[in-house]
Design a protein with these regions (language model features):
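Sec-dependent N-terminal signal peptides
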Residues: 1-6
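Acidic, low-complexity proline/glycine/alanine-rich linker and hinge segments
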Residues: 152-195, 233-245
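Acidic, small-residue rich beta-repeat scaffolds with periodic aromatic anchors
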Residues: 121-162, 204-207, 213
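Short tight loops/turns at secondary-structure junctions
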Residues: 196-224, 238
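Short, positively biased Gly/Pro-containing turn/loop motifs at secondary-structure boundaries
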Residues: 226-270
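An exposed acidic His-Trp-rich patch
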Residues: 73-137
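Start-of-domain marker
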Residues: 8-79, 84-85
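A short acidic/small-residue loop/turn micro-motif
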Residues: 78, 159-160, 192, 220-228
Length: 270
């Protein structure tokens, strides 16, 4: 399981990591794993400048891996400067940097021995995005398994998307017409829906294969209160449709365009 480095309500810029001389994005804040380090560092940041929503912590850390060890090389504080109307920053002075991280120093370097778990580094285009923390995926990702600052495992992935239908397309014009083609419900089977203008359902869980077949689909009818038969019919109708959009992410085919969507379905327009 990837480290839950911290939680954020909006998209966050990643840290920077250099591996074999290549600059990559580290999708997380490993400094936060040591609360003492984190709060000591925060106390050193300028207090008179507002942070930006894309970097609530107010800093970006720069890391590198050499001889299978994870090093923290520097920290850059960043804030919004209203005078120039831009994000500005500068590196924390070396004397301050080494004072904060002194307990992890080895010679003239900081070994990130407080870090254990899996961290994710990435490059390339974003293929999946949520406006929350580091919830996004790139074309090229590497999962590093870290034990007390030492790299003990590595898995590299080439992620991609296969086109097909996904519920985000319902935000386009003609959404209900499109939905009714995919989901032709037999409303006559449900007399309790005679006077209901619309129902709302949620796909709680979904699973797809590499060809866009929907293999598994768990549906909940949110409104109105209906029996399990309607939810089952919706699930079966969705599974009969093909192809669905497929995300291949870090070794798994995922139904990100289907799962956890809440969908309104118009029964009567009057």
């Amino acid at each position: 399981m990837l480290l839950a480095l911290t939680a954020y309500a909006t998209w966050q810029e990643g840290d920077v990591i250099y591996i074999n001389g290549e600059r990559l994005e580290l999708l997380g804040r490993p400094i936060c794993l040591d609360s003492t380090l984190y709060h000591t560092l925060k106390d050193e940041l300028p207090s008179n400048q507002p942070t930006v929503t894309s970097n609530w912590d107010g800093f970006t850390a720069y890391w590198s891996i050499n001889n299978d060890k994870l090093y923290l090389d520097s920290v850059r504080c960043e804030a919004y400067d209203p005078n120039v109307k831009a994000v500005v920053g500068k590196s924390i002075p070396s004397i301050t940097f080494y004072r904060i991280f002194n307990s992890y120093s080895a010679g003239n370097r900081i070994v990130a021995s407080w870090v254990s778990g899996k961290i994710r580094v990435a490059k390339g285009k974003v293929i999946y995005y949520q406006h929350s923390g580091f919830e996004r995926n790139y074309e090229e990702e590497t999962i590093l398994d870290i034990d007390k600052g030492k790299v003990i495992g590595k898995k590299e992935y080439h992620n991609f998307v296969k086109d097909g239908f996904a519920f985000d397309k319902l935000q386009e014009n003609g959404a209900q017409e499109m939905l009714h083609k995919i989901l032709p419900l037999h409303i006559e089977r449900y007399p309790e829906l005679v006077n209901v203008k619309r129902l709302i359902f949620r796909v709680k869980r979904a699973r797809v294969d590499e060809k866009g077949n929907l293999l598994e689909c768990n549906v909940q009818v949110v409104r109105p209160d209906a029996g399990p038969q309607l939810a089952t019919e919706i699930a079966e109708a969705l599974k009969n449709y093909h192809p669905w959009k497929v995300y291949y992410i870090n070794g798994e085919y995922r139904a990100l365009g289907i799962e956890n969507w809440t969908i309104p379905y118009i029964l009567h327009d009057k």
